[in-house]
Amino acid sequence: KVRPIRTCIEAGLLTREEIATVNQQMLENVRLSGMPSIGLTLYPPYPENFFTGGMAHPYVYQNGGDWTWFGGRMIQQLIAHGFIEEAYAEIRPMIDRVIQNKGFYEWYGKGGVPSGSGHFKGSAGVLAKAIEMLHKWAKEQNRSL
């Protein structure tokens, strides 16, 4: 699961090598799922009708949906631990979809379909913080992004 691992990184429990391994697994999950970013909540998703209601289908909401709110926090951890190139590459799909959809949606389904509120402050906040962190890194390196 993505969220507990990210929390372990935030808590300082993973080595740099372990963070790299986790990130590679997240990218592989994105590739296998066909979802747009590392905001993927889980992979593989629970099968069709495992749950009733809003999560009855795979890649919907918390059943494998793609949340910038989650992925953006992983981006922050990548930056904090020196994985700048990875963070820059992995934030792009999140920024691109905000621009394309003209909003900060809660989550995205298969095919990058935006869902939930288009004004989700959690998404806006984590992206803004990650962008600020990238700019701070660039300034410290006397570089531009």
Regions found by a protein language model. Name each.
Residues 1-66, 93-145:
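Extended glycan-interaction surfaces of carbohydrate-active proteins
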Residues 19, 86-87:
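Solenoid-repeat scaffolds in large eukaryotic assemblies
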